[in-house]
Structure formats: structure tokens, C-alpha cells
Swiss-Prot record:
Residues 963-983 are annotated as: Disordered. It comes from Arabidopsis thaliana. ATP binds at G564, P565, N566, G567, A568, G569, K570, T571. This is ABC transporter A family member 2. Disulfide bonds: none annotated. Keywords: ATP-binding, Membrane, Nucleotide-binding, Transmembrane, Transmembrane helix, Transport. The chain crosses the membrane at residues 33-53, 221-241, 279-299, 305-325, 339-359, 416-436. The keyword Nucleotidyltransferase does not apply. GO terms for molecular function: ABC-type transporter activity; ATP binding; ATP hydrolysis activity. Its main location: membrane.
Amino acid sequence: MTLQRGLPLLLQQYTALFKKNLLLSWRSKRATFLQLFASFFFILLIFCIQAAMEKSFASSTALKTVTDPTALISPPIPPCEDKFFVNLPCYDFVWSGNRSSKVTQIVNAIMKNNPGRSIPIEKVRSFVDPEAVDTWLMANPLLVPGALHFIERNATVISYGIQTNSTPEMNRGRFEDPTFKFQIPLQIAAEREIARSLIGDPNFNWVVGFKEFPHPTIEAIVALDTIGPTFFLAVAMFGFVLQISSLITEKELKLRQAMTMMGVFDTAYWLSWLTWEGILTAISALLTVLFGMMFQFDFFLKNSFPVVFLLFMLFQFNLIGLAFMLSAFISKSTSATTVGFFVFLVGFVTQLATSSGFPYAKKYSRMIRALWSLFPPNTFSQGLKLLADATSTPQDPGISWSKRAECGPNDDTGCVLTINDIYLWLLGTFFLWFVLALYFDNITPNASGVRKSIFYFLKPGYWTGKGGNRVEEGGICSCIGSVPPVDHITPDDEDVLEEETLVKQHSMEGLVDPNVAVQIRGLAKTYPGTTKFGCCKCKKTSPFHALKGLWMNIAKDQLFCLLGPNGAGKTTTINCLTGLFPVTGGDALIYGNSIRSSVGMSNIRKMIGVCPQFDILWDALSGEEHLKLFASIKGLPPSSINSMVEKSLAEVKLTEAGKIRAGSYSGGMKRRLSVAVSLIGDPKLVFLDEPTTGMDPITRRHVWDIIQETKKGRAIILTTHSMEEADILSDRIGIMAKGRLRCIGTSIRLKSRFGTGFIANISFVESNNHNGEAGSDSREPVKKFFKDHLKVKPIEENKAFMTFVIPHDKENLLTSFFAELQDREEEFGISDIQLGLATLEEVFLNIARKAELESAAVDGTMVTLDLTSGSSVEIPVGARFIGIPGTETAENPRGVMVEVYWQQDESGSLCISGHSTEMPIPENIPVTDPVAPGHGGVNLLGRRGRRQVQGIVIDPEFATFTRSGSTSSRRFSRSGSSRRFSS
């Protein structure tokens, strides 16, 4: 099958990624709806606020042109309850001068003759003099709107004074002027009744009125002008937060990393996001303008449609570039909302400064204006201000498209920035953010902690693709130390040495075996020591050698299984081969392409498939859509994609679930889909990193069948913690530990070389010699037969069977031994004899234990062994036989020892599973201390403290005795390679 290349592949990837973005947005309907229609709700809110403001001023003449004001004739004294802010019960007015009977009569007349209503006596309070009134007012605030002070000077002269609080009050948009509302009614009432009293005519009256000056319409407060910039910024924040969240989610879940391993171009990735977000931005800006016109705002009606639309679209488009850039520094999608709120808060503050005239006035320097204009909300706010000023009065025509480069009407800034200038600023800063986004995306650590040099774009190799594939580890603000070289150690295993010699010979001669898919040449990976500078602290890390020179061939049409405990270097090897991690030393050729060349890596990614350890899937996409996406990324011809997807779904038995979203899949279905993704496009090399983790047995068996069927025509590299899986699927197995290859070969080869020996399982008939039951007497002859001929005892026994471990050095005796045993089956009551090799798990544990023990001898890593006696000792990780200090007795002058049993925990690390019963230490066995004096043991929890009792390490080469019991059950698999003898 011919795959797409060059520009056609770029266009195909772009189309597939664009469709992926469209589907994700379509299926996140709530988020997409808010992004597009948030402007409607904010504009509706502005409309309601504007309507409320207009209603509150409806009775006021301030917003009207008044040429002939209407006079207000003799207004009455209002009830005190009409005052905006008053404490109840209150008084309509208070007065002083109550020692005068004439003054008292005048006040009574004021109360009686108040137009429209008389004032009850309980609503008025009298005092002797103004000082008494002041004292009462200070003690009783907000109880009365005004006071009258009368002084009877003689029979014909009565003077008075009025006391009110002259501060205007405001409540819910309405103003209360005490002069007009309280002072003038009190003044008219006092003068009227004083005049009637002095002339003696109670019916005397005159008309007194007052009116405001003629005035034009006062410019009203427009809600859109005051709160519009903040609301429109909030509208844009919806798309901003969603964009950052989408980018970070793909990075956090390693979805982008998966696409990179499959060969996606960065250009296609960023262009697909830019195009889709640009479309959403254009729709959002269009709807914003249409909603503004629908609510009849002059801002949208008078200004030219393209002028307003372009301002909103360029602003939101600018925020896309800002979101791209900020996403490079954020690692958690949950932080997207926090970042969005912070940008909104900063934008709100800077918009307030911009609305006050800073810095878009001639008194500010161009440098300040340029720096201020880099932040998108600032130029957007200034653009809104210019458009609002152009429609501030009914006579203002707004800004047309042809006059966008001219100074707008009512521009009080000195015309330092026109609408056209704002367009150019928004467009220019978008390209600035976008270029910075691409730059920071390359120099900030990705999900694997890898980044490029900060000067990567200055290197010719980056542009030509021939200068290597140089990347670095660590953050931007970390100082990477020198990488210490890896000391070459000649392998002590003959198979590993033979493999290394063969690869070195091919490398020196420049030969490439046509039957070899992957040739690893001294691959080394060291994480350098770094110094990270943070706030008031400095963190240092030491160099760590993850791979210490790996040499091996992986043949075509074979499945190579890479085993090893946690930290062995399996995943690091895969990450180096797939280009996720840079190699420190050595190289690897995949079908003749070097992983250290960017051109070679580009070719490699076209021919590999990867099933990561954890499912890397979009919950919102179906299984069929996943396969179509990755098929397009791999460059399959468009005409063959549908048929290839149907075939892949059928292979993993997901045809019926192909159109169901992956988020609804079970764990097993997701793993099957991940395997299908790795096999899409018929890759020549497939990496399967623990493909059956967490599967139920039935699903696991089915996935094994899939892997077996797809082995032909390609090479497969498998990592797993399941020894059964490795035994069944692999053609060759390599076991790694501590960054080195410890053994390599077929399963049979490894079992025969590293197993404890042969496993003999003897099954007994239900009755012996017609006794009706199998007692212990019927098994004793068998035990004696094994002990006399092979010097072994059973490691496990019950009334139905016995299990013996026969050392390899007895292999030459087995033929005659089992021939005689088979001849005596009836005598011994034996129903079945099985002979097999040790299990692969035992081989793995032996290799892992040895590596851990070597490491413990260097760094003193210890773990606690709890004995059945209740005591505990510190032992090196991986030690098999341990002498117990302080157990010397007359019966056992050298003390006792135990065999420690090890197993893998759920994370793949070695842990203690139990130990044998205590046994005497034979005289011929040399013993050594696990840690040299003063070395300072460190346990697995990393604690240093008081020195505990340390066990004595016994070399297993000398421990050739037999074992008869343990504190934990140890069973041996009866499946696999075995010979079966039955009567």
C-alpha cells in the first residue's frame, strides 16, 4: 500500500484533524452554545439595565429639551415618609419659638392649611430655641426632613429661618434635591401664614411658583458605553477558556503525543485548531453584532456593520493566539478556568484605565501606547470607546467603512489612534502571540518532559531536517548539568554477549541484515542532573542512567518480548525508539532509518504503530472515528480508509460498537481499540506496551489471538508484566534490569539456563493396594526413591500429588530415573507423572533478584524481612538466602538461615512474598555482610535512622541443599513445556 507523502499528506492530516475538532465541538453542545450565544444574554442584560435607567429618569426633565419650563405652584409640605432615607416614626417638620403664643398660632395654621392634606399634631414637634433643635437632631438622626425657627421681635415683625440637609440623595437611579422637595414648601407655608397673622386676614392668599431654567437635553448615561467593554470581554472569555482547555486536555491526556508518534505534522495540528477556532470566532462576532442590532442599540445601528463586526472578530481572534501561547505553560486542564479568570480580571482593570483616557492621548509617549496595546483588551476597549463616542448623540452619524482611518466624531484623545489603527494592532499582536505559541510549544517540556533548545530555530538542521533530532530534558528555568558517560560493562551472559558482538560487527561493517527490523546499537539514555530555580528555593537532581548501552537485533515476522521490573528501562527503550525521548548515546536503525535523524524519524513514524500502556482515546469520538483519524494521519489513501477501518474493527470484534463513543466502552473494549489503532495502516513495526493490562481473562485471550494473527509480515515489540502472556506470544524474550540487557533468547532457552531446574509433578491414585485411601505410607517410598537417586525432597505435597524441583546438574540421570519410576508406577500408586522446565516467572525473578542484589551492594538499598519468630532483619533487595545473626547454638554452631521468596507487586517492583522455615547453615557455606561498615543502609522508604539488625547474605552457589517447607505457598505451573508419563 502506497502511503501519502508531502503536501497531500499534510492536507489529509489537516482535514482529519479539522473534522476531529468539529466533532468534539458538536458533541460538547453546551460549551459550544455558550461560546456562540453568550453575547445574547449579556446584550439582553445591557438592554434591561438601559431600560431600567430610562424608566427611572422618565419623570425627570434632565433628559429632555426644555424651552418653556412649567412652573411648580405652591407645593405642599410632603409627608416625612416620602424622604429617601428616614427612620420611622418620623416628623414632617420641627420648629422652635414655642414660648410665643403668636408663633404657636402660626405653626398651627401651617399644619391646618397645608395644601392637599392637613398635618396631624403628632407629626410635628416643638422646641424652645434653635439650640434645642440642634441637640435633638444630633441625638435623633434621619427623623425629620426640615425645621422652622421663629422669632417674634415685636408686634409687627416676626422673622423665621429654615433648616434642612442640603445634600442631595440618590436611590435606585433617582435623585432627591432637599431644596425643591422640602425647603421651598416650608418657606412658602411659613411666609403665607406669617402674612395672614400680621394683616389679620385668614383668607389672604397669593400664588407663588418656581420653575427651572430652559436647557437642552443633558447627555444620558448609556449602559452600553459604561458596562459594555466589561460584558463583551466576558463574552470573549468563554471561547478563550474553552480553547485553552481543549489544547491542554490533549496535552495532559497525551493525545497529542499519540498523534505525534503516529506521524502528525505540527503544521497540520496548529492549522486545524486555528481554522476551527477562527470559524467559531467569526460566528460569535457576527451573532454579537446581530444581537446588538436586534435590541436597537445606536452603537450597532449607526456605525457601519463591517466596522463593528471586524472589531469584535479581530479581538476574539487575537485571544485565540493568546490562548495558544498560554497553553504552552499550563499542564493541567483544570487550570484553564483560573487562567481565564485572571486574564479577565487584568483586562477589567486595564479597561478601566483605558476608558479614563490612558494612554491614548497625546500627553503619553508612543512607547507607553505601544506596550499598552500589546494586551488585546486594551485596544479593544479603545475601539469600543471610539465607536461609542461616534454615536453619543442623536445627531452623530457613527463611523463608516470608508472613514475608518479618519478621526471619529467627538474624539477627545487628539486622534492618536483610529479604528483602522486598532485593526492593525489586533492583527499584528495575533501573529505575535501565534509565533510565540509555536516557539514556546517547542522549548517548554511536553508530556514526556522533553523540549528543544531555546535557540533551536537558529540551527540549520531544524530547517533542512538533516542536522539530527536534538532535543533536551528539563524546564526552561533549569540548569542542566553535564551528562556523565556510561561505563561499558562486558555482559556476563553468553547469549547477551553473542548478541552484542553480532550487532557491533554489523555496525562496523555497515551491514544491515534484511531479516532484521530493528537494530539497536549501544542505545544509552541518561537523564542529566538539573538545578531548578524556584521561588526562594533551589532543587537539584542527580544524573540517572536509564539505559546503559543496549545492543540487540529484533527480527521481522517475530514478536520480541521485553521484560523487566519497574525501572528496568523497558518504557524508556520504547520512548527512544518512537522518538519521544532523545537518546544520550548510541543509535537504533528501524528498517534502515536512524532514530537520531529527523528525516529518519519522520520515515519511522510512517511505518510504526503504538499501543501505549494507558488508553489514549477521546471519550467523545467513536471507535470508527478514532481509526479514521489515525488512518488519515498515517497517510492511507482516502479511497481505502473506510474499508481498512471496517477490517480493523472486525479484527478486534468491535464492528457493532464501531459507532459508539469510546467513553461508553468498557476497559477491555478500549484496549482492543488501542490495539486496532496501533495496527491501522499495516505498520511494519508495532509497539505494544502492556496491551492487556486490566483485562478479564476472556478478553485477554482474544487480544492474544489478535496479536498472534497480526504477527506475520511485521515485527512486534511487546512489554508486559504477565509471564504467561510473554511465554505464549513471544518468539524471543529479552529481560532487562537496571538499564541493561541481562538475558536474551527463546522461552525454552531462558528456562533451561536460568530456571532452578526441572519440575516433576507426581499424582497418586485415590487408593493404594486396595486400602481405600492414600495414606502417608503410600507416599514415603516415592519420597525415598527421589532422595536416594536425585538427593531432592518434595517442595509441596498432599495426599493427591507431590512436586519436586530437580537441579540441572541431575539432567543426565533423568532418563534412567524416570524410566524406572514409570516401571514402578503401580508399586508406588502413581497415576500420572509430569516433567517440565521451571516457569518463566521463576526465570524472571532470578534475573531481577540478581540485578537488585548488585545494585544493593553499591547503594545499600535495604528492605525489612519479618520472620515468623516475630523478629525482623534488614536484607539487601534481591537476596535469596539470608543467615539470621544471633541464632548460634550448640546444636547449630553457625546459626540458622532462611530462603527469601520474591515476587512482583502490582506496579512491577520486587517485593518479599515469604520465606522458608529456618534451617541450619552448613559448614561449607561462606557468608558475607550485605553492607560494608559505615556504608549506611537506606531502606526502600528512604529512611535513615538507628541501625537495625542486618541479615547475612549467603551465596546461592553454595546452597545446594534441599528445602522442605515455607511460610508461603509456592506453586509451579503445570502448563508449558513438559513431558508427561502416564499409565
